[in-house]
Amino acid sequence: MKHFLLFIFLFSISLVSHAQNETQKLALLNSAKYFEIKSRANYTQAILKAKENGWPIRYKSKNNASVNLVGIDAFGQPKYLTTFADPIQAITINTNKVWPGGGLGFNLTGATDIMTNKLSIWDEGVPRPTHVEFGGKVVEKDNATKIVSHSTHVAGIMFSKGSNQLAKGMAYGIKGAYSYDWFDDESEMAAAAANGLLVSNHSYGNVAGWNFNDDSTRWEYNGKWNEKEDFKFGYYDDGAQAMDSIAFNASNYLIVKSAGNSRTSTGPKVGDTYWRRDENGKWYDAGKRPDSLSSNNAYETLPMDVNAKNILTVGAVQGIAAGYSKKEDAIMTSFSSWGPTDDGRIKPDIVTDGQSVYSTTNNNDSS
């Protein structure tokens, strides 16, 4: 899926950062404390229920995507986050046109002092801190220690300095950026916004509908025990409400989230074995898949907080080598999730290249 935005980011580089007024700042700090207490209590309850019901704390799904238990939802079901694959390219989104020599005269790179530590990444773990492309730029803020390939890949898209020109980041000149893991993200986002954060990227989201559990080698259906379509698609949940609350009180802060990859995670063939949860939340072998279960491969496949109203939700199109010039150039990827939301809003907000993008990895300091 779509990792990073940014013509929007580079546009915000040109803005003067106005401090939050005191009322907004207080509201954000109060929200940060509330979200922290709520998140940690919810996670503690989720761990207890996981032991009771045999829920995995962590596993791998197809394409080696990481999946983590982070809480329980309003219906008492486990809430998992998963990484979304493949970020964007500068040519497709036309970011290269606002760089020096890009033809528009903006000469934007992110190098201005006002942008230092105004950009942040929330992800599964930590970007490789010694990587040649951004070593010394990334400040880890929440004591996360696990170096993760996905996080390193996203960081490269955002601000690789361009030692390898093919992997040059959108804001390649930025002097400093923050990094957080995905636990307690709402609390951390509110606190960071109170301190002047301008842009954050979140290339992960909630597991919904069908998901292949690589560790258990089985297809799992994540809908409620008695439903044929997962309600989480298009649903405005408390996570979406939290995002909107933060954005409302931080008018200069842009939250960027991936739309998701649900349209190719369609479950087993009709008649093949699948698993789902019973009314108590325990996984069981549900036998042969009936043809009545949704394949989540059409419209309304955006999961939960991606449906927030005041964030930028980014979908994925195929890369456009020559750059975008007309609408026919943009061809949707087969995997990227689509709206609308349950209340009829159009999502995602924008689309850009999200397929097989070249960027940094955590294999070594120059990979």
Predicted feature residues:
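Flexible, solvent-exposed coil segments and beta strand-coil junctions
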Residues: N96, N222-G223, K326
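Active-site-adjacent substrate-recognition loops and nearby beta-strands
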Residues: T109-A111, A240, S258-K309, G315-K347, ...
